[in-house]
Amino acid sequence: MKHCILVKYNADIDAAKKEKLLSEIKEVFSGLSAIEGIHGVEVIPNVVDRSNRYDLLIRIDMEKETLPVYDDSEPHHIWKRDYACYLEKKAIFDYD
C-alpha cells in the first residue's frame, strides 16, 4: 500500500523556510525505515510555486497491516507534534 500525505504550508512560509522544513521532514521520516513492513519513504517537494498547489508529498510504501504501527511510531508523533503549526492543510490518501 502507498500512504500519501499531501501538505500545504501556511501562507507565511517562504521559500527559504520551505527548504529548511524539507530537510527536517526528510530526517524525521527517514526513521520509518527501521519499522518492519515499511518498504520505503519519499519526501517530494512540489516544483510549481502557485497558491492553488500543495507544497509537499510524503509517500510511504508499507504493508496495509503496518498502518497502525506507523500511526504509533515516534516519527509520526514528531511529525504531528512539531510540524502541524506550519500546515494550512493536509490530505491523506492510501492506494494499492
Protein language model regions, located:
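Short S/T/G/P-rich N-terminal loop/turn motif that feeds into the first structured element of a domain
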Residues: M1-Y54, E65-V69, D96
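An amphipathic, aromatic/His-enriched active-site/gating alpha helix that lines ligand/cofactor pockets
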Residues: E27, G31-E36, D61-F93
